Every structure is written in C-alpha cells, then in structure tokens.
C-alpha cells in the first residue's frame, strides 16, 4: 500500500509548495522509491484550460490530454514521471461530478452535503490509481485559512484515519520573515499558521520554513517547541540560485530523512544525487553564453511561459552554456516604426511561442520575417509555427492576403480551425467528432518526419510523439505554394493530413512545430529541439 504525504502551505501563497513537493519526490526517487505527485486545486474552475494566463500562468498538458496546473510541470521535470488526468483535481470538477451524480439519482434521495459527499469524492480521487507506488505526494493549493480549501483539509484529516497511523504524514510549508527594523527572523507567523492548521484537526509532522537567510538553531528549537514537532523536523528552506539546486539543498537540510523518520523508516543508504550535482555543475560553470529573444503575448507574467523558460534552460544545460532570455512584447513591433531591428539585432536566436488571439500577431509575423531575412535561428512553437507559415505565404509564396480564420474571415485561410479546411472545391467542414477529433487538439499525438529533414536529424528518428494544445492548424492545401516559397513541410500526422513540422533548408536553423516540445523537456533529459536550438544560437553568437 502506498504511503501518503500531504503538503500544505501557510502565512502567504507562492512559497514554493510545488517545488518542495517535486524536490522531495526527487529525493525519495534517488533512494529507490516509486513516487507520484498530485495537486488539489481549491478553485471552482473545472480545469485551468479557460483561465487567463495572467491569473493562472501556463496550462500544463499531459500525454492523456489533461489541462492541468503548472505545478504538474515541476513534478514531471523533477521526477521524469509523466503526469496524468488523475494527478490534478479542482473543486469545480469535484462539484461537477457530485451534481451529475445527484441529477442521475445516484444518492437515492439523500441530502447532498460537503461532509460526507464532497470529502468522500476528494478522498476517492486521492487514493485512485496508486497501485505499485511507495509514496503519493498530495499538494493542497492555496493557504491554510482559505475558505475554498476547507473541504480538502477535512478530507486529508479523514484520510489519515482511513489510511491508518504510519501510512500518512503532513508536511507544512511556512514563511519565517526577516524584520529589518528588529534585525531578526520572526517565528510568530509560523506558530500562528500551525495553530490554524491544528484547529482543523491536522498536526504537521514536518515543518519547512522559507527564509532568506540561515535559520539560527535557537529559532529552530523555538519553532519545534511551539509547533509540537521534533527539532530535526524543522527544515530551513533558503532561496536558491536555481530551482535545480533545491533538491540538493533540501537533502543537505535533512528533509528526506525527516520525512522517512516521520514514517518510522530508517534512512540507511545515501540517495544517488549524481544527476542533480551534474546539472548544477553545468549551470554554475558554463562555457559560453547566448541571448534568446522570446517574442510573445503574455510576457507580463512569466509563469505563462514556465515550461518554455525551463526548456530553454535545459537546452543550455545540454550545451553547457548560460541562456539569457529577453522577453519581448510582440505588440511593441506593431507600435514602433523601426523598433524591430533595435530589439532583435542583439539576439542570437528568436523564438515565438504558443498563444491565442489576434493581439500581437503582426508583431510576431514581423519577428519571423526578421529571423528569416537576417538568417537568425528561429523556433516557432504552435502559434509560432502558424505565424511562420503566414509570413512565408505573404512574403515568399506571393499570397499577400494570407491569414488565419482565428482572427476573422479571410480569403486565404493558410491557418484554419481543425474542423474546417480550404480545398480546391471550397471550404470543407469536418465534424468535431470525426476522425480528426474535437475542436481542441489536446495531449500526445504521433507525427512522422521526412527522413532527410533537419527535424529528423535533430530527433535522430522519423516517428515521434509530442503533446498538443490548439484549435487551429496550418491548412495542408497550401502546402505546395508554401514549399515553392522555400518552407518545407517536414513533419506530418501519420495520415498525412495535419502539418506538424515546417523548416527552411536554406536557413541555418528555422523550425516551426505545431506541438509543444517544452512540455516534455527535463533538466536531465533536455528536449532535442531545444538542445539543437541553443546549439544554433551558440553558433550564431560566434558570428556576431
């Protein structure tokens, strides 16, 4: 039977519960245990798929097509365990399920209440699909005291009894702030947070204390005394120069040993942290430096591109170079005459990421043109590939009116909804439930690369599988025109209907992909496209 680790947070939000959960899972993995991490999100949205990137950050997509919290990206990057639909639940989905059951009469006329119906649904989710695991780590979103999280707190309190003593523990992450006027760290917020937690019937077994400077032994002992935990179970969590140094830091402070001790497990052998020390060696001792210009729409909140940021870092790790990322608002290129060159000339490579909507699209197209004409390495992801196709259609294929139906009616739909295509016979509609699936293409799909293509060389294979999240596709009926203009369709869906990869053979490095390769990149296994892209940027840096 799997043991459960429930992770809660207190004092303030954004302390790093997700990173702590991912790091702890990585440490347990390094000791030979099989782990899985889950996220409980108390918000009432069914999933984050329709939430604003400015509020929620990126939507992380799993192989099975789940639209999930960005923390699942951390979990997968740190452990290498692919996330699943069963690893993320929201209050919205819980209530949706319960209401559907009530409407069907599944409750046989009973009064449906938070206890037991909501809490039972949460417990059922937590315990599902855990066969063969040693540890299941469950992160509770939000902060202790939030109204939204109360049903989840009650559910995990009940789970401790359901699982039996010794089969679950509680880890609580808090803030120990430094008050400059007093010249000391203050433990009172942590004490109050634990008091709030115990008032809900939950006594933490391990306390992880975020602080910006070392936690003195006296303060550590004070926290242990007032919060009713052993001193060795009070774990300082200092700021780190890189998130990939966090597992090493937590191990040094004894987090994994404290967790095993709370379960009554003796930590016999040291964990194998070789790959984490190697990653940090490459990050701290780079042999070069590149600057990547990311021309996007949501640059006001970098969490909107979290996986992309990390994948670029992974590309740097693969090449042992430091990657500097310049986030550039695509709308700037629509407002400032001649501003493109000033912004992009210092860049060693240009990337246009995914996104939705018309705002900033002409700026992205201008960035594609700059990269194509100046022979600067270009990487287009999802919308970035579509913009590359529209730019190519307009400027190298002679289709001046080329556009996408996403932005409105157009006479030249080079990009269109998955359910509609332009052929020689006119606009063709495909049913949402047909062979091509629904209007949102989600999750992992296979693709086939041309054997002599740049993409196949990068992958070292011709059959690949990548994750998608999009409603629009490049219209395959424009393939011949675009290829005459030098933009080659080097990757297609297995049935040959959906373009997956485009490239320019006459360019040093120009690749567009309809999928999201950043979702599968890991620090110890960088995605080949990002490794190759950063290598091309490094080559470009030596030319300027």
From Swiss-Prot:
UniProt-annotated catalytic positions: 382, 516, 518
Disulfide bonds: none
Domain Glutamine amidotransferase type-1 per the UniProt entry, residue ranges: 291-543
Annotated GO CC locations: cytosol
Keywords per UniProt: ATP-binding, Glutamine amidotransferase, Ligase, Magnesium, Metal-binding, Nucleotide-binding, Pyrimidine biosynthesis
Residues noted as binding Mg(2+) in the record, renumbered to the chain: 71, 139
Annotated GO MF terms: ATP binding; CTP synthase activity; glutaminase activity; identical protein binding; metal ion binding
Annotated CTP binding sites: 13, 146-148, 186-191, 222
Reaction equations catalysed: UTP + L-glutamine + ATP + H2O = CTP + L-glutamate + ADP + phosphate + 2 H(+); L-glutamine + H2O = L-glutamate + NH4(+); UTP + NH4(+) + ATP = CTP + ADP + phosphate + 2 H(+)
GO biological process: 'de novo' CTP biosynthetic process; pyrimidine nucleobase biosynthetic process
Binding site for L-glutamine: 54, 355, 383-386, 406, 471
Region (Amidoligase domain): 1-265
Binding site for ATP: 14-19, 71
EC number in record: 6.3.4.2
Pfam families, A to Z: CTP_synth_N, GATase
Family matches, as PANTHER family: CTP SYNTHASE, CTP SYNTHASE-RELATED
NCBIfam families: PRK05380.1 (NF003792), PyrG (TIGR00337)
Family, similarity comment: Belongs to the CTP synthase family.
Reported function: Catalyzes the ATP-dependent amination of UTP to CTP with either L-glutamine or ammonia as the source of nitrogen. Regulates intracellular CTP levels through interactions with the four ribonucleotide triphosphates.
Protein name: CTP synthase
